[in-house]
């Protein structure tokens, strides 16, 4: 029964962000079809953050009307909406409308908003629901949350989403560039453009290398239907969790009952022994030495600030520039960084099950370390299209490793902070979810003008890129 519950909790946790993560990994294929092009990631970031109206409403209701708020119907609703929205995506993702000065993916943006509303609201409903289960299941929930990024990434990898190659493109003189190709290559040598001449010296045509996307193994329609199936599995898992014979609140009630019993017995045993020894009583309260990190108000404030900061980096700041930081090193580096960093998330959560460390100084140091890797990723994005060691194998290894370690370190921190707050109270988990969304919102609001308005980042075409040594 315990193994089945772990499996259900893991599947349930996967539903927290699987839909939005699926959109992100499908972006390399979507940007070639939608009119927004490579500005689509920053548009998505803003649309996703607008959906924070959902968690804001839930948090306000929890604060002012806690008695009228029940997570169960909200969770059923958001999972059902997510399943339907993913199914609609399969048929409407490429529908465009003429708005103001051009065509825009209005249907895509509207459906993205509903998916984001589902996933953002999960932060303030799924975690409080987990307080009804024994503490050992919370880490399993975070493993499932990590799988919400890994499984779509593996599907996108099987799809071949966004794989590119370099082709020779012939451009006749005094004409616009042609898409006709005269050959294919997989890397760039020498100059990126040559001119053909006849015997009289007249220029005939220009030949240069350009990136071309390879056909996907299956269409976005199939991909989004698979996403809808994943969401349906999450809905079924939550339904089965509700049908489990053991009441969800029993773990907490049993703990409180055992504490009352122990406290009521202690004075009788200690009538002739002086003041009661606090040792056994404190042990019965669930290892308070591990919970002291969240007992002091300053420590609690530090935890919430850390939650907001970590999620600002992982959900708002760095995702907006991943393409800029990786594509200059080539499509292989980009795909490895996206896929392996998605694998780092559940692996870090799984590691926390066997190597838990609740020390706030340790988590602070790990946050600084992860932030350092994030700073390297940001620096390479700023230096695009000619970052450090561009064109060298060491540069590719560094950028992939940096993204993996960035996600891995901060994912571990997020899990342990959630475990600390879970031991405090259900309300602490609600505010933890609010801090998650606040940090994500602030990160997105910071990056949107930098990417779309000021345009501080330059995209790179790996095939035609020439950087000075």
UniProtKB/Swiss-Prot annotation:
The modification Phosphoserine is found at residue 251. It catalyses: riboflavin(in) = riboflavin(out). Plasma membrane transporter mediating the uptake by cells of the water soluble vitamin B2/riboflavin that plays a key role in biochemical oxidation-reduction reactions of the carbohydrate, lipid, and amino acid metabolism. It is found in: Cell membrane. Residues 1-6, 65-71, 127-137, 242-297, 357-361, 418-427 are cytoplasmic. One of its GO terms (biological process) is sensory perception of sound. The chain crosses the membrane at residues 7-27, 44-64, 72-92, 106-126, 138-158, 221-241, 298-318, 336-356, 362-382, 397-417, 428-448. It comes from Ailuropoda melanoleuca. Keywords: Cell membrane, Glycoprotein, Membrane, Phosphoprotein, Transmembrane, Transmembrane helix, Transport. InterPro entries: Riboflavin_transptr. This is Solute carrier family 52, riboflavin transporter, member 3. It comes from the Eukaryota.
């Amino acid at each position: 029964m315990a193994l089945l519950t772990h499996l259900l909790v893991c599947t349930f946790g996967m539903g927290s962000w699987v839909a939005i993560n699926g959109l992100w990994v499908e972006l390399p294929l979507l940007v070639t079809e939608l009119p927004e092009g490579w500005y689509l990631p920053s548009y998505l970031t803003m649309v996703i953050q607008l959906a924070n109206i959902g968690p804001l409403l839930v948090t306000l209701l929890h604060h002012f009307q806690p008695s009228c708020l029940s997570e169960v119907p909200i969770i059923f609703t958001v999972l059902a909406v997510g399943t339907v929205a993913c199914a609609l995506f399969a048929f409407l993702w490429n529908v465009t409308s003429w708005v103001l000065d051009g065509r825009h993916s209005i249907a895509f943006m509207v459906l993205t908003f509903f998916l984001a509303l589902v996933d953002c609201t999960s932060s303030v409903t799924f975690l409080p629901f987990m307080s009804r289960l024994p503490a050992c299941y919370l880490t399993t929930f975070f493993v499932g949350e990590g799988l919400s990024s890994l499984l779509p990434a593996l599907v996108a990898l099987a799809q071949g989403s966004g794989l590119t190659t370099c082709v020779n493109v012939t451009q006749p003189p005094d004409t616009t560039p042609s898409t006709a190709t005269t050959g294919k290559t997989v890397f760039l040598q020498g100059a990126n453009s040559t001119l053909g001449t006849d015997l009289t010296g007249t220029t005939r045509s220009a030949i240069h290398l350009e990136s071309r996307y390879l056909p996907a193994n299956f269409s976005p329609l199939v991909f989004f239907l698979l996403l809808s199936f994943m969401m349906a599995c999450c809905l079924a898992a939550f339904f089965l969790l509700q049908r489990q014979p053991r009441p969800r609140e029993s773990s907490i009630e049993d703990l409180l009952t055992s504490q009352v019993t122990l406290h009521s017995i202690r004075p009788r045993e200690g009538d002739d022994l002086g003041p009661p020894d606090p040792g056994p009583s404190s042990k019965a309260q669930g290892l308070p030495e591990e919970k002291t990190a969240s007992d002091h108000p300053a420590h609690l404030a530090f935890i919430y600030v850390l939650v907001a900061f970590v999620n600002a980096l992982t959900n708002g700041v760095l995702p907006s520039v991943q393409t800029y930081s990786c594509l200059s090193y080539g499509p292989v580096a980009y795909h490895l960084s996206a896929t392996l960093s998605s694998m780092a998330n559940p692996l870090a959560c799984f590691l926390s099950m066997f190597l838990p460390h609740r020390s706030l100084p340790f988590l602070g140091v790990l946050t600084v370390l992860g932030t350092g890797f994030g700073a390297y990723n940001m620096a390479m994005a700023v230096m695009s299209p000619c970052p450090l060691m561009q064109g060298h194998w060491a540069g590719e290894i560094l950028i992939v490793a940096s993204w993996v370690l960035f996600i891995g370190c901060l994912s571990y921190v997020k899990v342990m902070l959630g475990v600390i707050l879970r031991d405090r109270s259900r309300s602490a988990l609600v505010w933890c979810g609010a801090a998650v969304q606040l940090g994500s919102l602030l990160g997105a609001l910071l990056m949107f003008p930098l990417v779309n308005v000021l345009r501080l980042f330059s995209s790179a075409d790996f095939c035609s890129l020439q950087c000075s040594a």
